[in-house]
């Protein structure tokens, strides 16, 4: 080497990233998927369905925030109001919450950037169960094995063209009193006491003494308790009539 040549030592050079402490934008347009609305979701679900799922969707605010976002944290509360748990982390803009015993609960999400900074929470959305309990207005207790009992709309899958949207859903208990035209009680049922028939009643058209009642119109008042978050919707009084045809 010539005496005036220089040697450059790069051994002390340090490569570093800027310490990013700025959290990303929170996700927006957070909602339950339209395909998971009560009517749509239960359109083809059997009356005995016990395995449920929710799908939630969202988007970022703008392109800059989207590029700064790497993951999303999903938080869930089964009581719908507090005690939220982080149940998943995903890079998608949707999440399917599977293996649920019911639909009710609440969700919020946060965004995570590449440095691990977490955004403020999104809006919280609540998902409630889809309560349903419908009673027919006629039954024929003649022992032919068809429509012999007064029971809510239900099928084990053997009825063709059955509307599964009418299945009893998320019912805790049923208490019903049935009277004749004079107002005399001819039958009563409490699902919490008669656990064999439960919410299905299965009235055979006989009075409380076991005597067959004549073909006629009878009137009922039923108090139905549902498994829902909304307490205003948890207890419903259903009044109606049913005709016995023999």
Predicted regions and their residues:
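Beta-strand-rich modules
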Residues: 1-9, 96-118
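Beta-sandwich strand segments
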Residues: 4-11, 117-122, 228-237
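Proline-centered linker/hinge motifs at extracellular inter-domain junctions
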Residues: 22-28
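Short loop/turn motifs at secondary-structure boundaries
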Residues: 25, 47, 51, 126-246
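Short, solvent-exposed loop/edge segments of extracellular or virion-exposed proteins
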Residues: 29-41, 138-141
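Conserved aromatic anchor
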Residues: 42-67
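Recognizes extended acidic, P/S/T-rich segments that occur
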Residues: 68-102, 194-196
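Extracellular Ig-like/FN3 beta-sandwich strand-entry sites
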Residues: 69, 102-106, 171, 215-217
């Amino acid at each position: 080497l010539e005496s005036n040549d220089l040697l450059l030592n790069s051994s002390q050079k340090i490569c570093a990233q800027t310490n990013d402490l700025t959290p990303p934008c929170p996700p927006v347009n957070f909602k339950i998927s339209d395909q998971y609305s009560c009517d749509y979701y239960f359109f083809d679900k059997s009356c005995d369905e016990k395995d449920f799922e929710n799908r939630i969707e969202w988007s970022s605010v703008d392109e800059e925030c989207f590029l700064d976002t790497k993951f999303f944290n999903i938080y869930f509360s089964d009581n719908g109001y507090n005690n939220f748990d982080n149940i998943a982390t995903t890079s998608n803009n949707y999440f399917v919450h599977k293996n649920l015993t019911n639909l009710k609960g609440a969700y919020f999400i946060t965004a995570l950037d590449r440095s691990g900074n977490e955004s403020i929470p999104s809006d919280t959305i609540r998902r409630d169960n889809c309560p349903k309990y419908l009673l027919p207005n006629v039954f024929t207790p003649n022992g032919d094995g068809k429509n012999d009992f007064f029971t809510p709309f239900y099928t084990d899958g053997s009825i063709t063209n059955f509307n599964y949207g009418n299945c009893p859903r998320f019912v805790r208990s049923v208490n019903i009193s049935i009277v004749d035209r004079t107002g005399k009680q001819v039958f009563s049922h409490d699902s919490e006491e008669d656990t064999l028939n439960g919410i299905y009643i299965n009235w055979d058209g006989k009075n409380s003494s076991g005597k067959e009642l004549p073909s006629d119109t009878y009137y009922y008042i039923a108090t139905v308790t549902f498994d829902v978050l909304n307490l205003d919707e948890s207890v419903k009084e259903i009044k109606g009539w049913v005709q016995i045809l023999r």
